[in-house]
Amino acid sequence: MTTTEPRTEQEILDRESMDDVDAIAAFNPDPDEVLHAVQDQADALFTWDYSKGSRPRLDKLYEKAKVSQWNAQTDLDWSIEVDPLQAFSIFTESSNVGTGHWTEHPDSPAKNWGDKEWDQFSIESFAWRLSQFKHGEQGALLCTAKIVETVPWIDAKYYAATQVVDEARHVEVFEKYIDEKIGVRYPVNPHLQLLLDDIINDSRWDMTYLGMQIMVEGLALAAFGLMHQVTTCLLYTSPSPRDLAV
């Protein structure tokens, strides 16, 4: 079975210091890139043990997933009108929500911004965050597909297959929302891409699973929850647990 040797922080980050400001501020050099290849170091495993239910907890999750399917195109109310300026304009000159450190430096371009500039920044910032959610969900889609290939138990393969479909819906919903309601999209952040690459590149299925659940889904859930609290968009704040789920 293929194995991956642990890498140093310098190798993972591709820089000598974790505090390298220029590297931290890196941007995507090719925003028009359509395809991005990552080496998958893992072996695809067949199992000839088809004993369904040998792992009851996974079997229970699999059965639950089969009856909880939904359609991103028809189960959400896409007729709801969204005004990005009203729904997501939380950074304003008067509210000063989280903007103090951006305006204190004398050379900051935001120092003399008024509400017009903060409104535009809010929309762009929200579009950037939604775009990163979408890219992260595609990362989770690839991770779950890899888990189907690499996990050794049939119950785990069954359940992971339902997660592949679920992550595909998440990507679909975010893209539809961005395309139809916001109209502004951003390429993947290079640091998020680095994280996704490293998770997918690892040969160990359990590390792929942990990386997906803790680093990708966990961070996304926290950020998504914060955005859920500050927006007034009815589609975005729908109470259904299936709506725009991460």
Spell out what each predicted region is.
Residues 171-228:
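Active-site-adjacent scaffolding segments
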Residues 1-145, 149-157, 180-187, 203, ...:
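Terminal targeting/low-complexity segments that flank the catalytic cores of oxidoreductases
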Residues 236-243:
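Conserved small/polar residues in nucleotide/adenosyl-binding loops
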Residues 132, 136, 140, 152, ...:
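Short, contiguous, pocket-lining structural segments
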Residues 153, 158-183:
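Carboxylate/His-rich catalytic cores and anion/metal-binding grooves
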Residues 144-145, 161, 221-226:
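A structural feature that tracks compact, well-ordered secondary-structure segments
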Residues 228-235:
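Acidic interhelical loop/turn segments
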